[in-house]
Amino acid sequence: DLKDNMKREYPSVYQEAFEIATEWAYRQSQINMAYQQNRIVRVPYDPNLMVYTCRDIWWAWWWDDTSIRFFQIFWNEIRWIDYREWSWYWMLYVLTNIIDQKPYKYAAHIWPHDMRVHEQMSWKTRLEVAKEAWYEFTLVESPNWAVSARINIVRDLFSNMRFDSKNCLAWLNKIKNYKRKRNESTWQFM
């Protein structure tokens, strides 16, 4: 409506400017709540629990970026114990020098649907590289859900999550500052 458009275009007080700046942040309030509830603390590796990994992969014609999150499940609690990210490394390097060097006992490696893309360095798919390295993994196909539905699933699970305050800090800062995009012509969130 006109009032919201005016506030967005011409914030008149600092509170309106702050609301506009933080309005598009998906997870900022959830991260703040996790700090208040002491769910962002040191979360050590528990050798009695298996570790799961999940990845995020970005690819551009000039580089490959990847991140790995390490978590354990204890009853209904998801414990994020570690996070690593890197650029310009082959998948084989990541498998042998990052995954294998951790003291963790792994239950499963969850890979995103885009494992079928070719690595810039080797021109093999990440799937081929992982199979050549004898890695067992679960390939997650993206369900054909709306972005908002996927966001709500994570929002529902978020209260059951604890994060290691040291090992996961870079990831927490990234997701805290992640902003949703808006179509400039319709002002609808995408």
Predicted stretch roles:
Residues 46-73:
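Gly/Thr-rich phosphate-binding beta-strand-loop-beta motif of the actin/hexokinase/Hsp70
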Residues 14, 56-61, 85, 113:
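Short, flexible loop/turn elements at secondary-structure junctions
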Residues 1-55:
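ATPase catalytic-site recognition across NTP-hydrolyzing enzymes
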Residues 27, 41-42, 61, 91, ...:
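Polar low-complexity intrinsically disordered regions enriched in Ser/Thr and small residues
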Residues 69-189:
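Mg2+-dependent endonuclease catalytic cores in nucleic-acid-processing enzymes, primarily RNase H-like
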Residues 3, 61-64, 88, 168:
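Active-site-proximal structural scaffolding
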